[in-house]
Amino acid sequence: MTENGQFLDYKNVFQENRGAMHDGRLQLLKEKIVFKNNKTGKIDSIQQNDLHSALWRRVARDFELKFQMNSGQVFRFDGFKEMEFERLKDFVKNYYKIDLEHQELSGKGWNWGTTDFEGNEMMFQVGQKLSFEIPLNNVSQCTQNKDEVTMEFHQNDDSELSLMEMRFFIPPSQDEMIDKVKDFHDNVMAKADVLQVKGTAICVFQDLQCLTPRGRYDIRMYPKFIQLHGKTFDYKITYTSILRLFLLPHKDQRQIFFVVSLDPPLKQGMTRYHFLILLFYKEDDLAVELSLPDDEIEERFGGKLQKDMSGPMYEVVSRVMKHLVQRKITVPGSFKGLNGVQSITCTYKASSGFLFPLERGFMYVHKPPVHIRFDEIAYVNFARGTTKINKSFDFEIETRSKNNFVFSNIERDQYASLYDFVHNKQLKIKNIGKDGADFDLMVDSDEDADVHDPYMERMKQEAAEREKQVDDDDDDESEDDDFQPETNVAEVEEEYNSDVGSASSGASDEEEEDGEEEVEEKPKKRKKEKVMKERRQKETPGKVKRKKKDPNAPKRPQSAYFLWLNENRGRFKAENKGISVTELTKLAGKEWKKIDPDEKQKFERMYQKSKVKFDAAMKEYKSQGGGRTSSSPAKKMKMKSPKPSKASSSMVSPSKFKSKEFITESDSLSSSDSDAEVKSKNSPPADEESASESEAASEEEESD
């Protein structure tokens, strides 16, 4: 709640609509009361001069504020705390010149009592106290029987539980001239929202093309509702259920969409139509005559409508609809796309259509139609495919309620205009990088996708940066840690062992070598797996280990803010029952900014005292040897030093088994391990020599 001398602002208030509670924002201003529905965006405005009475009473959801207007219309708002009564009472008294009365309800639970009709409501009273009340505009039908009256109610799809009907038994009167049942029925029907076709329509539009629901309909305009008469179905739409009107030009500039937003929607079986979409051709003309007398037309519409009207069909229909429904018509605003078109061709849910960027939202037509207000949008996202032949991108919208809308196959040439529009409307863009390069990459793309694809270039650049980062991490490691003589010997063995089979010849030699390889194959594989595992561990950048907290170290003092929060946490929970930890923290942060500096200074002094004690305790703790950590010497060895061959060879055990690839003639003649190793690297293996000798011998035998 925000309080100011000029207004009261409540951001978490609920309005009842045919059994469903819709959350929204309520503002009590000096001259009017405004409520905005968060779901539909509909704004209800109550002028100060139209207020008749105001009531405050206890209901299931905290407390309720009820306003009744001079016309009998009623507005109810739930979700107030009991402590708000005095503040609201003073505000209503000072600015609206009416008293906010506290009304007590009857809780006896009796099902008999008396009824009273006041305004648009029927009140059921028990013992001179109100038990319940029924808004008569929620009644869809009322029938009378001998001693009973049955009331049926409109249903709301958003309501989990709905009241279907109520029956009232009315005992007969002793006076035969008075029929109480009929009087009760007439009082209900006088205010009920029953759509009955009585008299002639104000005007009729014949054979209009309708995209949703699909077909051709005759549209009849009555004083309180619209009737759509088709070959198969009939629909009735009350003027109060119409939220918005849109007049949107087709891309070909020859057709016009006229869109009517509905809440509650039209129903056809299990199908719901939240939008009525009519399609007009600009060259079609229409002449219509209103059935109202001239003086009534002048009084109701103030010269904005005439008895006889003619012109383009879309202009006449939209003009009559606007003044009968009393809703403004929304048209495209400042957005100009490719070739000056005010719409964007795209695909939504496998159907092609048009996306219209409007001044306060986006409208997509026509299958299925979608309207997204800017205040519903959490962020937008520009995405595109990775193929080189793709010359389009996707426009994604995520709402605050976590609903995603993806409009795909948008031409790349539309990107610049759509990006500028989104940026000017200050919508959050999800995928803008730290360098802001996404816009340039899309706009500067060559038209020939085979020549240059900036998206692929960006992906390659990011991959190169990641590889460079991994290489930098590898360079930081010490070479001494990597040096393992035994592993190096095993690697050399594997390198030379791979060519042994190809160097040998003769059946007997191959059989012998195959037998030896079977024996040695398993340990060699295990060595190879171990080496590869160590390599992978080396290539993977190591994780930064968090330093373990010393349990014996003195605890740091809390800041002034947390000292204040701990002292006031109980008060926040008491004032806001059921509040989450996140919301409590936000609320506390806002109040901390607003508190008096002297109050803040009090907690600052408490923090300084605690800090002095902490510094002294930490000094004593360190003087006793606390907080010291030992570092491994291996991590400190970062300098590269040359390694002599003797040092490396001496680390290999003389009794270490060597495969026959390493045994050369020099091994039997030289006593130095280093000489043997050098020769084994520079001279071919012994098996290769023996293999060549055996080949030569076999050639001689064949020649003989």
Swiss-Prot record:
Which keywords annotate this record? Chromosome, DNA damage, DNA repair, DNA replication, DNA-binding, Nucleus, Transcription, Transcription regulation
Q: DNA binding happens at which residues?
A: 554-622
Low complexity: compositionally biased ranges:
498-507, 644-656
The UniProt entry, under InterPro entries, shows: HMG_box_dom, HMG_box_dom_sf, PH-like_dom_sf, RTT106/SPT16-like_middle_dom, RTT106/SSRP1_HistChap/FACT, SSRP1-like_PH1, SSRP1/POB3, SSRP1/POB3_N
Q: Which domain of life is it from?
A: Eukaryota
- GO cellular component entries: FACT complex; nucleolus
Among Pfam families, the record links this protein to: HMG_box, PH1_SSRP1-like, POB3_N, Rttp106-like_middle, SSrecog
Q: Which CDD domains match?
A: HMG-box_SSRP1-like (cd21994), PH1_SSRP1-like (cd13230), PH2_SSRP1-like (cd13231)
Q: Which SUPFAM superfamilies match?
A: HMG-box, PH domain-like
Drop me one GO molecular function for this one.
nucleosome binding
Which SMART domains does the UniProt record give?
HMG, Rtt106
Biological process (GO), any one: regulation of chromatin organization
Q: Where is the composition biased (Basic and acidic residues)?
A: 460-469, 531-542
- Please list where the region (Disordered) is annotated: 460-562, 618-704
Q: Where is the composition biased (Acidic residues)?
A: 470-484, 508-520, 686-704
Q: Where in the cell is it found?
A: Nucleus; Chromosome; Nucleus, Nucleolus
Q: What does this protein do?
A: Component of the FACT complex, a general chromatin factor that acts to reorganize nucleosomes. The FACT complex is involved in multiple processes that require DNA as a template such as mRNA elongation, DNA replication and DNA repair. During transcription elongation the FACT complex acts as a histone chaperone that both destabilizes and restores nucleosomal structure.
Its assembly, as annotated, is: Component of the FACT complex, a stable heterodimer of SSRP1 and SUPT16H. May also be a component of a CK2-SPT16-SSRP1 complex, composed of SSRP1, SUPT16H, CSNK2A1, CSNK2A2 and CSNK2B.
- Family from the record: Belongs to the SSRP1 family.
Q: What is this protein called?
A: FACT complex subunit SSRP1
* Naturally occurring in which organism (per UniProt): Ciona intestinalis
* Upper taxonomic lineage: Eukaryota, Metazoa, Chordata, Tunicata, Ascidiacea
